[in-house]
């Protein structure tokens, strides 16, 4: 029998020179589209597998199943290509012993990938190269740092050095690099951290007699203690703000993600009867919605309330009239002492 159908698909890796040319022309190069080649011409499908000669802005595969020449070999050949420029996640890391730093390019899962301006990375059917080498800058800044002990009455207690830098709190207790994605910070050894002034303790004899007039030194000591407590309070407030901002960003991303599935979510959050349709990742269109009468039916016009949302409905047999509903309270017997 010679009537079988064979379908194959092959991914071609694009070299550095070709990628650079694609970037300049903003087009990608493919081979000739072959349609219904039969007989000896069907051998054309096995030639020219380099994908040359046709420049396009983008192209998708076209699957064909035509066979108009019975008992003859026939073939179809199609190409797919595309070109785009996108930003990649990056992470800065520094070595503690040499103080040398390097920028790593990350994939969507946060794993480092080997893509540079000189090396093409072929991954998941995509060939990619960096258009520009990643760089970083260094600077020296003065930061407000406090020496904090978990238990100031215990000399063995853990001591931490917290520093406020650009509205973020960094723990610089160890003389090592503290890296957070695109930023690495290290405290200079010779720099000093503000310590808590020595305070009176219940197990230490008082330095003055109760009832005596406070000296200038006593007042200066109290002033230093208050200044330290004020700095500590401001640092804790900044730390709280950082956590709140992080939660706000997470909530924003969550709402945007869910709103692409639930078109009424944004309207409900705005307390408006509108439906949202996303035009891009961060742009959406709002359209007014009608408000059905409450507590009458699960259907209204050509819509039905199903799985927590109003959706289109053409089957009237699913509509239920519950205008004579009865409210049910489940906590009537609950007593609070």
Curated annotation (Swiss-Prot):
- Coiled-coil regions listed in the entry: none
Q: Tell me, which GO biological process terms does this entry list?
A: fusion of virus membrane with host endosome membrane; symbiont entry into host cell; symbiont-mediated perturbation of host process
Look up and give the membrane topology term.
Answer: Single-pass membrane protein
Glycan attachment sites: 76, 114, 271, 301
Keyword list (alphabetical) reads: Fusion of virus membrane with host endosomal membrane, Fusion of virus membrane with host membrane, Glycoprotein, Host cell membrane, Host membrane, Lipoprotein, Membrane, Palmitate, Phosphoprotein, Transmembrane, Viral envelope protein, Viral penetration into host cytoplasm, Virion, Virus entry into host cell
Q: How is it modified after translation?
A: Palmitoylated.
Record's subcellular location:
Virion membrane; Host cell membrane
Entry superkingdom: Viruses
GO cellular component term, pick one: membrane
> Does Transmembrane appear among the keywords?
yes
Q: What's the short name of a Pfam family annotated to this entry?
A: Baculo_gp64
Similarity remark: Belongs to the baculoviridae gp64 family.
Q: What does this protein do?
A: Envelope phosphoglycoprotein which mediates the fusion of viral and host endosomal membranes leading to virus entry into the host cell.
Q: What is this protein called?
A: Major envelope glycoprotein
Identify the coding gene: GP67
